[in-house]
Amino acid sequence: MKNSADITVLGAGSYGTALAISLASNGHKTLLWGHDPAHMQTLAQDKCNQAFLPGIAFPECLHIEADLAKALAASNNVLVVVPSHVFGSVLAQAKPLLRQDARIVWATKGLEPETGRLLQDVARDVLGEQYPLAVLSGPTFAKELAMGLPTAISVAGTCPKFTAELVELLHSPKRLRVYANDDFIGLQLGGAVKNVIAIGAGMSDGIGFGANARTALITRGLVELTRLGEALGASTATFMGMAGLGDLVLTCTDNQSRNRRFGLALGKGCDVDTAQAEIGQVVEGYRNTKEVFTLAKRMGVEMPITEQIYQVLYQGKAPLDAAKELLSREKKSETPAQ
């Protein structure tokens, strides 16, 4: 079946819209679909996403499509950019409408709610083994990507041909550099764990601990990510790249990050509900914390920072008490004996 569009993007929030803008700015005919018909009508009329990316006009190659069936019929390349807690339900909605030659890539960062399973497992459960799968991950703020500021990300998947073609489709010499990676598991993990650590970095700064503490937390957070990744069969090299260290540093140090701002509010004394309300958009790290904590327990992996953040978010522990517990942990070597 011939494509009438180069790619269809499912998810018209800030990040989905930003990726659609980037693709269309590169000359690719891009369809953008979202679940709210009224929102999609507004996007079509305004030719920008005023709610999430105000003032950034849509390129001519970006088209709004409110009908999911038409959106999925237009292209075999489907980019899913929705919150992790609705990832499975969106795939289930799309499944009967997918083309036989469809290929699925997602930029969703997170794990399955409650179970902590990787999104690849959710996708396979919903879609079966028929479709090639891939994931995008890396240090990207939606606004900067949409504005065309230089950005770099990584892509990995189940099919090398699909991965290579995604690199070509997404890459733009002026705005977006895309690195191929063969670590499908590592890219998925990095995007979830960094959200958790960013909340911790925000809490540390909100308490007033300063740059030394923030840097220590980021560094030990990277250790936790690597430890979990190794247990799941990921490559440690991945966590030194865009989807690991890159995304972790970005999200932990810049206030464009909702997760960091959420942590800041908690560190300054807000309760969880008030802090979430202040952000006004989905704080992926809130759910990610429970997901990562669940996965770590199931795998028997020690993640003390993640555990303390979990206790703050879900058990009412004070951020300062969590910090004190981390600081009072038993002394240990940074380079354990092999």
From Swiss-Prot:
Q: Where in the cell is it found?
A: Cytoplasm
| Residues reported in the UniProt entry to bind NADPH | S14, Y15, H35, K109, A142, R258, V282, E284
Q: Annotated pathway, please? A: Membrane lipid metabolism; glycerophospholipid metabolism
What GO annotations for molecular function exist for this entry?
Answer: glycerol-3-phosphate dehydrogenase [NAD(P)+] activity; NAD binding
Entry annotated with the keyword Transcription = no
Q: Where is the active site?
A: K194 (proton acceptor)
Binding residues annotated for sn-glycerol 3-phosphate, in chain numbering: K109, G138, T140, K194, D247, S257, R258, N259
A GO BP term, please? carbohydrate metabolic process
Can you cite an annotated GO cellular component?
cytosol
**Keywords tagged on the record:** Cytoplasm, Lipid biosynthesis, Lipid metabolism, NAD, NADP, Nucleotide-binding, Oxidoreductase, Phospholipid biosynthesis, Phospholipid metabolism
Q: What is its EC number?
A: 1.1.1.94
InterPro entries in alphabetical order: 6-PGluconate_DH-like_C_sf, 6PGD_dom2, G3P_DH_NAD-dep, G3P_DH_NAD-dep_C, G3P_DH_NAD-dep_N, NAD(P)-bd_dom_sf
| Reactions mediated catalytically | sn-glycerol 3-phosphate + NAD(+) = dihydroxyacetone phosphate + NADH + H(+); sn-glycerol 3-phosphate + NADP(+) = dihydroxyacetone phosphate + NADPH + H(+)
Q: Name one Pfam family in it.
A: NAD_Gly3P_dh_C
Q: What EC class is this? A: oxidoreductase
* Sequence similarity: Belongs to the NAD-dependent glycerol-3-phosphate dehydrogenase family.
Q: What is the role of this chain? A: Catalyzes the reduction of the glycolytic intermediate dihydroxyacetone phosphate (DHAP) to sn-glycerol 3-phosphate (G3P), the key precursor for phospholipid synthesis.
Q: Could you tell me what this protein is called?
A: Glycerol-3-phosphate dehydrogenase [NAD(P)+]
Protein species of origin? Shewanella sp. (strain ANA-3)
Q: What is the lineage of its organism?
A: Bacteria, Pseudomonadati, Pseudomonadota, Gammaproteobacteria, Alteromonadales
The encoding gene is gpsA
